[in-house]
Amino acid sequence: MAVQQNKKSPSKRGMHRSHNALNVPGIAVEPTTGETHLRHHISPNGVYRGRQVLKNKSEA
């Protein structure tokens, strides 16, 4: 089992962890319907960048 040679100070420990933070996912609002969705993903009703790309089940 590995054993540290010297204790890492709280400051150095914090600097080591500085890149471990999680980012908030990018949320976009569809301009035509006003629904929110993840960026670069279609909205739940099948609209992407103002265009209907998937047919709704009620329309099919």
Curated annotation (Swiss-Prot):
The keyword Heme does not apply. Keywords: Ribonucleoprotein, Ribosomal protein. GO terms for biological process: translation. GO terms for molecular function: structural constituent of ribosome. InterPro entries: Ribosomal_bL32 (IPR002677), Ribosomal_bL32_bact (IPR044957), Ribosomal_zn-bd (IPR011332). The keyword Ribosomal protein applies. Transmembrane segments: none annotated. Residues 1-60 are annotated as: Disordered. Residues 9-19 have a biased composition (Basic residues). GO terms for cellular component: large ribosomal subunit. Belongs to the bacterial ribosomal protein bL32 family. This is Large ribosomal subunit protein bL32. It comes from Delftia acidovorans (strain DSM 14801 / SPH-1). The gene is rpmF.
